[in-house]
């Protein structure tokens, strides 16, 4: 089992150091463990941060908020940015090669595949006036 709390904090600190113009706020509960491959977490965190950083380029007061909490027996990782969001069909966002910018369009589809292949769940909430939120639910 991996200490997801500690892993979250490592990525948060790394991105805070490298992107000091973006406010990164976090609320991470301590000592929450998950059965998951560390390399998958690497893919998930790096893609989520990359997407948010690209979305926040022209946003005033760019902010990323990350939380990790335990509700019942589930761990819920929430990743939010106050970028422009997306008004189209949310299902498009997880289709391979779909992109709203000049990129491969593989990031969210890869995250979704990793999450669902491991029998976990991912929810996306977004629109053009309230940013982008992704919630990953790790079932115990």
Task: Label every model-predicted segment.
Residues 2-17:
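Short beta-to-alpha transition helix within the HATPase_c
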Residues 23-33:
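Conserved catalytic submotifs in the C-terminal HATPase_c
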Residues 86-97:
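Short conserved segment of the HATPase_c
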Residues 111, 115-116:
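Detector for a conserved hydrophobic position within an alpha-helical segment of the HATPase_c
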Residues 119-126:
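Glycine-rich ATP-binding loops of the HATPase_c
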Residues 41-45:
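A residue-level detector for a conserved hydrophobic packing site
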Residues 81:
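Acidic ATP/Mg2+-coordinating residue in the GHKL
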Residues 61-73:
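Short beta-strand/loop element within the Bergerat-fold HATPase_c
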């Amino acid at each position: 089992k991996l200490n997801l709390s500690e892993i979250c904090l490592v990525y948060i600190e790394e991105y805070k150091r490298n992107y000091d113009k973006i406010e990164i706020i976090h609320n991470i509960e301590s000592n929450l463990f998950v059965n998951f491959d560390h390399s998958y977490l690497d893919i998930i965190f790096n893609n989520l941060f990359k997407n948010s950083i690209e979305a926040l380029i022209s946003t005033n007061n760019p902010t990323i908020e990350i939380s990790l909490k335990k509700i019942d027996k589930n761990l819920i990782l929430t990743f939010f940015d106050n970028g422009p969001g997306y008004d189209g069909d949310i299902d498009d966002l997880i289709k391979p090669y779909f992109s709203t910018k000049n990129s491969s369009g593989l990031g969210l589809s890869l995250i979704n595949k990793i999450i669902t292949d491991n029998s976990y769940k991912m929810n996306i909430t977004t629109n053009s006036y309230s940013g982008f939120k992704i919630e990953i639910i790790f079932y115990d």
